[in-house]
C-alpha cells in the first residue's frame, strides 16, 4: 500500500536565471515499439540544460520582470527565461523539478507551495507530488488565535509530477491559469522576504529538463522545434492529426494520468520528424484483458472519420460473455489512408498479440487494404448495419424509392440460398430500373463480404446483425456526437467505460443467481443451458426453445452416408403480420453429433436455432452436443479461460509488463468470484490482505 501526505508550506522563490542561452540537443527516442522493420515512436525527447544561478545579486524589478501594465495591474513579461510548465517535461530529480517550478514562479510573479506528496509505504521513497500556487485553496478560519489577512483565492495553478521507470520526474498534469493578480503587486509584497541561497558546493546548478516534443500547448505544432513557424499552419495536412489548440496536450495529459493510476495502460503516438502528431493508439488494462477473452471476433468502427466527426476516432470492439459490446482499444487517425490504418493495425497486433478470426468493418478501401496486409488470414466482412443505414442517402432520390428499399430488404434478409439472392437482386435492379445505380453496382460486386447468404461459414458471435431490425451500435453512441470536441470526449470516455464495467460486473453477479423459476418450458435443452450460460445469453437461447413450438412437420428428406437432411417447417410472420410457412433444411450427423441449419444461426449468433433443436429432439437427443456449447457464453468463462491461459505460460523474469498482466488477471478472478455473495467477499478480502502482507514482508527484507 502507498500513502499520501499533505504538506502545507509556503516556499519562497529563491533563484534567478543567469544566462539567456538554452542549449538543446537530441536524445535518443524515449519509448519506441519495434514492429518488424518499423520503429513506432511514442515520444522523442530533448535535453535542455538551464543555467541556475544562486548567488548573483537580484536585478531590478523592471529588468527581471519586464514592464508594468497600468491598465491590468500586471507585469508584462518581456524577458521570459523559463518555458511555462508543460505535460511531458522530465527532470533528473524531484529537487530539479521543484527548483524549476520555483524559478518559473519567480519569473511570473507568484509563490509556490507543496500541496501533496506521495511516499512508498515501506521505503519512504517519494514517488509523486503536487506543487501549487501559494494562493491555492482557502485557510480554515476556526480556532485561530489571530486573524491574518486572507491571501488564498482558490487559485487552480499547479503541476502534478510522478517518478517514472527511468527514475526521472515527469510532469503529468499542468494548470497555468491563476485567478489573482501576478507580477508587480505580488512581487512587491514578497520581495523583502526573498533571499538568494548560496550553494557552498557550486555557484551554478544545472537543471536537466526532458521534454516530450510530441506535446504542445497549442495545436499540432512542436513548440521546441526551430521549424515552428514553418509548420504553424500545417494542421490541415492530411498527414497530420487535425487538432485544435490544446488538444495534443490534453491527449498526453490524459495518457499520463491514466498511467499514473494504472501502469498497464498502454498508448503509442506516431509523430513525424518535426514532432507533429499523426496517429494515436491506446488501450487500458481492462480492454487488454477483454481482448484476450473476446478478441476472436472484432468490429473496427471508422464511421467517426468517414462521417466527418469532430474527433477522428477509430474503435475496436468485441462481444463479451453476456453478448454485449466491450471495448478492446481506440485510436485517433490523421485520415482514411492505408498508411494510417496499417500503422494502427500493426500496433494492435503487437500489443494484443493475436490475429482476429473475423473482422467486421465499414466499407472502406484503405482499411480493407491494410487488413489484408496485417491480418491476411482473418475473415474480413462488411457491416450490414452500416450498409442498411446508407440506403436513404444512396437511394433516397429515386422516384420509386419505397419499392426499391422494400425489394432490397427482401433480397438481403429473406433469402436462404445463393440462387434465391441472385434472383431477388436481379428482379430488383431490372424491374425498378436501377441496374445503372453505381452504389448498388458496387454492393453487388462485393456481395460475398456483406450479404448473409454468402457468410454462413463465418463465425460472427452476434456482430453480423443478420436479422431485420438488428443494428450494430457504436460503443460511444450516447457519448459522442458530430460536434463533440476532443477534450470533452476524453472526459466522456472514462464515463462510458465506468458504466460498461459496472454493467458487466452486475451481469456477472446476476448470472450466478439464475434459478429454475425463470424456465419457461420443460425442454431439456433449456434446463441444460440455464446452468451453464450467462443470464443474457441464456435469455437469447431461451427464445429459440420457445419458438420450437412454431415449427412442425420435421421430415427426413435425404440420406447421404452418415449425413441425413431434414426439412423443418415454420410459421413465420410475413407481410402485413400474416403467418407464412417456410421450409428450413437441416443437416444432421448422429455419429459425430453435428447439426447444421440452412439459416446458420449458430455461426451468426453462437447458439443453435429452433430448427436444429427440433431435429435433435426428433432424433431423441436430450442434451445439446458439447461442440455447440461455446465456452465464451459460459458464466464461468473468465475463470476457465484464465486456467488455460494464465500462469501456465512462460513469463519473462525481466519484463514488468508481463508481471503486471499475470498479477492483474489473477486478482481479477478473485474480484469476480468474491462479488458473488457476502461469504465469498469476506474470504476474498482476507486472502487479498494476507497476500499484501506477504508482499510487504519481501519489501522489508530488501530494505
Curated annotation (Swiss-Prot):
<comment type="similarity">
    <text>Belongs to the FHY3/FAR1 family.</text>
</comment>
<keyword id="KW-0479">Metal-binding</keyword>
<feature type="zinc finger region" description="SWIM-type">
    <location>
        <begin position="584"/>
        <end position="620"/>
    </location>
</feature>
<dbReference type="Pfam" id="PF04434">
    <property type="entry name" value="SWIM"/>
</dbReference>
<comment type="function">
    <text>Putative transcription activator involved in regulating light control of development. May have a role in controlling flowering time.</text>
</comment>
<keyword id="KW-0863">Zinc-finger</keyword>
<protein>
    <recommendedName>
        <fullName>Protein FAR1-RELATED SEQUENCE 6</fullName>
    </recommendedName>
</protein>
<keyword id="KW-0862">Zinc</keyword>
<dbReference type="Pfam" id="PF10551">
    <property type="entry name" value="MULE"/>
</dbReference>
<dbReference type="InterPro" id="IPR004330">
    <property type="entry name" value="FAR1_DNA_bnd_dom"/>
</dbReference>
<feature type="region of interest" description="Disordered">
    <location>
        <begin position="1"/>
        <end position="29"/>
    </location>
</feature>
<dbReference type="GO" id="GO:0008270">
    <property type="term" value="F:zinc ion binding"/>
</dbReference>
<feature type="domain" description="FAR1">
    <location>
        <begin position="99"/>
        <end position="184"/>
    </location>
</feature>
<dbReference type="GO" id="GO:0006355">
    <property type="term" value="P:regulation of DNA-templated transcription"/>
</dbReference>
<dbReference type="InterPro" id="IPR018289">
    <property type="entry name" value="MULE_transposase_dom"/>
</dbReference>
<dbReference type="GO" id="GO:0005634">
    <property type="term" value="C:nucleus"/>
</dbReference>
<dbReference type="InterPro" id="IPR006564">
    <property type="entry name" value="Znf_PMZ"/>
</dbReference>
<feature type="domain" description="MULE">
    <location>
        <begin position="297"/>
        <end position="392"/>
    </location>
</feature>
<dbReference type="Pfam" id="PF03101">
    <property type="entry name" value="FAR1"/>
</dbReference>
<keyword id="KW-0539">Nucleus</keyword>
<dbReference type="InterPro" id="IPR031052">
    <property type="entry name" value="FHY3/FAR1"/>
</dbReference>
<dbReference type="InterPro" id="IPR007527">
    <property type="entry name" value="Znf_SWIM"/>
</dbReference>
Amino acid at each position: 500500500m502507498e500513502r499520501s501526505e499533505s504538506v502545507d508550506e509556503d516556499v519562497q522563490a529563491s533563484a534567478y536565471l543567469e544566462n539567456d542561452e538554452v542549449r538543446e540537443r537530441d536524445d535518443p527516442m524515449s519509448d519506441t515499439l519495434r514492429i518488424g522493420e518499423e520503429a513506432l515512436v511514442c515520444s522523442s525527447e530533448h535535453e535542455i540544460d538551464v543555467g541556475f544561478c544562486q548567488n548573483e545579486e537580484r536585478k531590478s524589478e523592471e529588468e527581471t520582470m519586464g514592464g508594468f501594465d497600468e491598465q491590468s495591474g500586471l507585469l508584462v513579461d518581456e524577458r521570459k527565461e523559463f518555458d511555462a510548465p508543460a505535460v511531458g517535461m522530465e527532470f533528473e530529480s524531484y529537487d530539479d523539478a521543484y527548483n524549476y517550478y520555483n524559478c518559473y514562479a519567480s519569473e511570473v510573479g507568484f509563490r509556490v507551495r507543496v500541496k501533496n506528496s506521495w511516499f512508498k509505504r515501506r521505503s519512504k521513497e517519494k514517488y509523486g507530488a503536487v506543487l501549487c500556487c501559494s494562493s491555492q485553496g482557502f485557510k480554515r478560519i476556526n480556532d485561530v488565535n489571530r486573524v491574518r489577512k486572507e491571501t488564498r483565492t482558490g487559485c487552480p495553478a499547479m503541476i502534478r509530477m510522478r517518478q517514472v521507470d527511468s527514475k526521472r520526474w515527469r510532469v503529468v498534469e499542468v494548470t497555468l491559469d491563476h485567478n489573482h493578480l501576478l507580477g508587480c503587486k505580488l512581487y512587491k509584497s514578497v520581495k523583502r522576504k526573498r533571499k538568494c541561497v548560496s550553494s557552498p558546493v557550486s555557484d551554478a546548478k544545472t537543471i536537466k529538463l526532458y521534454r516530450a516534443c510530441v506535446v504542445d500547448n497549442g495545436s499540432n505544432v512542436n513548440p521546441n522545434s526551430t521549424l515552428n513557424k514553418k509548420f504553424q499552419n500545417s494542421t490541415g495536412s492530411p498527414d497530420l492529426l487535425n487538432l485544435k489548440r490544446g488538444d495534443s496536450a490534453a491527449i498526453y495529459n490524459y495518457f499520463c494520468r491514466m498511467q499514473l493510476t494504472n501502469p498497464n495502460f498502454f498508448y503509442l503516438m506516431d509523430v513525424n520528424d518535426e514532432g507533429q502528431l499523426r496517429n494515436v493508439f491506446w488501450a487500458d488494462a481492462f480492454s487488454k484483458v477483454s481482448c484476450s477473452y473476446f478478441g476472436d471476433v472484432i468490429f473496427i468502427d471508422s464511421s467517426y472519420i468517414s462521417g466527418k466527426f469532430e474527433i477522428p476516432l477509430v474503435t475496436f470492439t468485441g462481444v463479451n460473455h453476456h453478448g454485449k459490446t466491450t471495448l478492446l482499444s481506440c485510436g485517433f487517425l490523421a485520415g482514411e489512408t492505408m498508411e494510417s490504418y496499417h500503422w494502427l493495425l500493426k500496433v494492435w497486433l503487437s500489443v494484443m498479440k493475436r490475429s482476429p478470426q473475423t473482422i467486421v468493418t465499414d466499407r472502406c478501401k484503405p482499411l480493407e487494404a491494410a487488413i489484408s496486409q496485417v491480418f491476411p488470414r482473418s475473415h474480413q466482412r462488411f457491416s450490414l448495419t452500416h450498409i442498411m443505414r446508407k440506403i436513404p442517402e444512396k437511394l433516397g432520390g429515386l422516384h420509386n424509392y419505397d419499392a426499391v428499399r422494400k425489394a432490397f430488404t427482401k433480397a438481403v434478409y429473406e433469402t436462404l440460398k445463393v440462387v434465391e439472392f441472385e434472383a431477388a437482386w436481379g428482379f430488383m435492379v431490372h424491374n425498378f430500373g436501377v441496374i445503372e445505380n453505381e452504389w448498388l453496382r458496387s454492393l453487388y460486386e462485393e456481395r460475398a463480404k456483406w450479404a448473409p447468404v454468402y457468410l454462413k461459414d463465418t463465425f460472427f458471435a452476434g456482430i453480423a446483425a443478420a436479422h431485420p431490425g438488428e443494428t450494430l451500435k457504436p460503443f460511444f453512441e450516447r457519448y459522442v456526437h458530430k460536434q463533440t470536441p476532443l477534450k470533452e470526449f476524453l472526459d466522456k470516455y472514462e464515463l462510458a467505460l465506468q458504466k460498461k464495467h459496472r454493467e458487466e460486473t452486475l451481469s456477472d453477479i446476476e448470472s450466478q443467481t439464475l434459478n429454475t423459476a425463470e424456465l419457461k418450458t420443460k425442454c431439456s435443452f433449456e434446463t441444460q443451458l440455464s446452468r451453464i450460460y450467462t443470464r443474457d445469453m441464456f435469455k437469447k437461447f431461451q427464445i429459440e426453445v420457445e419458438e420450437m413450438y412454431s415449427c412442425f412437420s420435421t421430415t427426413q428428406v435425404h440420406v447421404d452416408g452418415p449425413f441425413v437432411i431434414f426439412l423443418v417447417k415454420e410459421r413465420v410472420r410475413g407481410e402485413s403480420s400474416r403467418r407464412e410457412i417456410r421450409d428450413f433444411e437441416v443437416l444432421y450427423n448422429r455419429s459425430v453429433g453435428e447439426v447444421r441449419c440452412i439459416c446458420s444461426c449458430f455461426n451468426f449468433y453462437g447458439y443453435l436455432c429452433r430448427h436444429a433443436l427440433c431435429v435433435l429432439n426428433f432424433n431423441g437427443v436430450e442434451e445439446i452436443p458439447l461442440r455447440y456449447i461455446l465456452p465464451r457464453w459460459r458464466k464461468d468463462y473468465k475463470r476457465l479461460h484464465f486456467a488455460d491461459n494464465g500462469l501456465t505460460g512462460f513469463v519473462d523474469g525481466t519484463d514488468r509488463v508481463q508481471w503486471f498482466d499475470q498479477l492483474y488477471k489473477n486478482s481479477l478472478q478473485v474480484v469476480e468470484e468474491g462479488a458473488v455473495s457476502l461469504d465469498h467477499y469476506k474470504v476474498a478480502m482476507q486472502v487479498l490482505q494476507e497476500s499484501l502482507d506477504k508482499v510487504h514482508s519481501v519489501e522489508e527484507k530488501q530494505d
